[in-house]
Swiss-Prot record:
It catalyses: L-glutamate + ATP = L-glutamyl 5-phosphate + ADP. This is Glutamate 5-kinase 1. It is an enzyme of class 2 (transferase). GO terms for biological process: L-proline biosynthetic process. Pathway: Amino-acid biosynthesis; L-proline biosynthesis; L-glutamate 5-semialdehyde from L-glutamate: step 1/2. The gene is proB1. Residues 282-359 form the PUA domain.
Amino acid sequence: MTKARKALENYRRVVIKIGSALLVDRRTGLKKSWLDALCADIAALRAKGVEVLVVSSGAIALGRTVLDLPAGALKLEESQAAAAVGQIVLARAWSESLSTHAIVAGQILLTLGDTEERRRYLNARATIGQLLKLGSVPIINENDTVATTEIRYGDNDRLAARVATMVGADLLVLLSDIDGLYTAPPHLDPNARFLETVAEITPEIEAMAGGAASELSRGGMRTKIDAGKIATTAGCAMIIASGKPDHPLAAIEAGARSSWFAPSGSPVTARKTWIAGQLLPAGSLSIDAGAETALRSGKSLLPAGVRQVTGSFSRGDTIAIIGASGREIARGLAGYDADEARQIAGKKSAEIAAILGYAGRTAMVHRDDLVMTAPSGARLVEESDEGKGKLHA
């Protein structure tokens, strides 16, 4: 896998995320001329053999304009009503703009469960794959008409990253009113440096993410870095670029300022990609330094190295693994229910049968079901022959 930046036309499958503020004017509604210019860019990429998917914000912003809702934060039911109206307007706009290039648009509305529950994830992936096979451009958005505050992606940056990993894209482009990553907010710090290339998302890079989003959108640099962690861990490069100019993709190709995030050099399997990208782990295991060293060496997580079990989860659920520093270092599929995990935490594997009353697995999380997510690891644990088929979702 190359760590060098390539021209957009040299990628195989590209996911493009559009921020609400780019697509919708608070006073006049849809920015039709801008959308037409973007669709011309998409058509140009497709003509060069690139498959393109779009994650488009804007349904709520369009709906609130049509419904003449007041400025400021909306109540949940107001947001859902605005989304119901706006989704129709948004889908029609994309369909009309793409049709001028003889491209068919296909609308897909996702909820959190469509990427977090394995069976629904596979079904959504199959549907998107079929649309691409038929030559369509999938236009994807969160289904805000049914999403609640507690059960939602919350922003389309992370949704776009999950879509990118779902479909095996090799590039994610986040277009917004931000032209890339700076060492500090440039409007607050005149000495802030622009980062053209990010080789790895380290804690220092994460600390550079600041800033709240605009009223029309829910995203910000924080969510873009989160999206980058999901995408790059799965081997997908990411670009953050300004979408303000007409023909924003052509502008990137022409050398406009943007930040490029290099993909992880590690190969990924579809199943492990799903594990790594889970947005809402069901619980967590806090481990000691010795266990962390073992995981980084490609070993399974044994009960002896577990210091604390948090949350309520079942065997096979995705859980976060917290290192000695207190930061998440990995994710994996639980080998035991939370109650059983608490009973055997800190114990030797040989004691499991006596404690639980049956001879369970020796590992709390098997290496075949484990993905390192910390920057210093940032890799997938290699699969072994031992235990293959166990805990496969």
